[in-house]
């Protein structure tokens, strides 16, 4: 059976007034259905560009992106995209925010509304559904943004550093919550992060993207029950680890 997602020697350049800038070159990797894969690398190495290509926001100049064996542009599989900021509309309630994608795509049905209600109830936002985003904590806002994405039932979920705007301790807690939600919902996910510890704790595999525009897949051999939860207090957990020397 073909991989849910496959990138085959994908390349892209940006054309600027000062010349051509190579953003990605010969990038190849795959993601199987049900996997949680992290794409790790320093700022400016093209991690977000990879997600934009997969989402169809950019078109590769070289290579091909396929989903279950079909070219990305011909695939009927839906892709959800969760960005760094939650992008909740402050003048809408949480319930109105999470229904927004369904309304735009004209997919608001009895079944989809029931699905949204279940997500809100199971993940602690049901009692806040008529609140506005400004009344919620950063972690609750991210949960609302995730539910808005899951409401569309995507086959693949792209996560572009969704915890980067949170403080370190909140980031640990929210990443635990989101990992549990995605596992319970059986979703396939590709996470972009520059935090190696975050990638290892959440992923089945880690793909390292370097400034040399190359990628290298690494399987995480540590069982999940030994990696989680990351929110357990540790004497040396006051500051985030410095992973800048790993690239």
Q: Which residues does each PLM region occupy?
A:
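A short, proline-enriched helix->beta-strand linker immediately N-terminal to the Walker B motif
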Residues: 151-155
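Conserved ABC ATPase "signature" region
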Residues: 110-128, 180
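The feature captures the beta-strand-to-loop junction immediately N-terminal to the Walker
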Residues: 40-42
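Conserved ABC transporter NBD signature motif
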Residues: 63-75
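Conserved ABC ATPase signature
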Residues: 132-136, 140
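Short coil-to-helix segment of the ABC ATPase nucleotide-binding domain corresponding to the Q-loop/switch region
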Residues: 92-99
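Helix-to-loop junction immediately C-terminal to a conserved catalytic motif
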Residues: 55
